[in-house]
Structures are given as structure tokens and as C-alpha cells.
Amino acid sequence: MTAGAEPPDPDTLDVEAVLLASEQRPISPEAIAIATRLAERSGAPVHVLTNARIWGTSFGFPNPGLYPSKGEWDKQRAIVDETVRALERAGVEADGHVIGARNATKRIVREARRLRCDAIVMTADESRNRFVGNFMWSQEPQRVRRRADVPVYLVTAP
């Protein structure tokens, strides 16, 4: 599959694992439903991943004041726990974890490779102009789609 291309119909894709990812936003029930469809068809597990954003560097060096706060970590853990429970209620094997990264796109794609996922599902905002979108954190799912070498299903946030 070509990076950035529209993914195939979820009912035609055989997968060994699915990554249900978020750059920091809550994972929508619609995204959970698509991940469930993909996983049930092949009996695959779903790995849930969220990112607690690291806000940058100070003079080129990591700065503890720019790391996620305890509250931010807890919020992301709650999103993962809620999503894993929803997947397990649907009868899908699921696990999850939270990462901390400045560049969520690179980490999500790297985790998908490491976990040998054949598809990524993310909740996303409407796509913006690519030039403007590159400056917006909310366009991270679109950047994941452009960079990933597996199908990326973007579910528009309600």
C-alpha cells in the first residue's frame, strides 16, 4: 500500500494486529467500532496507544518543565483503560499503553511496526489544507496516514 492512500474496505482486510492510536484526544466509539471490525474478521488483537505530548525543548535540551504533567499522564491512561474495556466487552483481545513523545507521528508509526500491526485506526478532525495542517496538532492523524506503510483508517470526530 502506498503511504497516504485511502485504505481498503475494512471488511476485505486480513490483519494480524490492529493499532488503535490517539495523539492525545479521546478515542471515539466509531474508531473503536472500526478497530473491532478489523480485529474480529481475523481474530487479531487490538493494541491501544495514546500519546502524552512532550511540549518541546529549551535551548535544544530536554526540559522537565515541558514534559507531560501527572494529570496529563493520568488522563491518557484513563483513555486507554476505557478503550481497552470497550474492546474487551466487544469480545476483542486488547491491551494498551501510553507513550510520551514530541513527534507523535513518528512514534505511532514506529509502534505499529514494532507491534507488527497491519492497520492503524485513529479519530481525526476534518483534513485541512496540507500547508496549514502541518502547523496544527489536530492534524496529526493525517500525518500518520502520509507516513505509515500500512492502511490508516481516519474516523472523523463527532
Role assignments for model-derived ranges:
Residues 1-13, 88-120:
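Structural beta-alpha unit
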Residues 7-65, 147:
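Small/aliphatic-rich secondary-structure junction motif
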Residues 47-49, 95-99, 153-155:
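General small-molecule cofactor/ligand-binding pocket signal
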Residues 63-67, 113-115, 138-140:
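Short, hinge-like loop/turn segments at secondary-structure boundaries
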Residues 65-78:
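A short acidic, glycine-rich active-site loop
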Residues 142-158:
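Short, flexible loop segments at boundaries between secondary-structure elements
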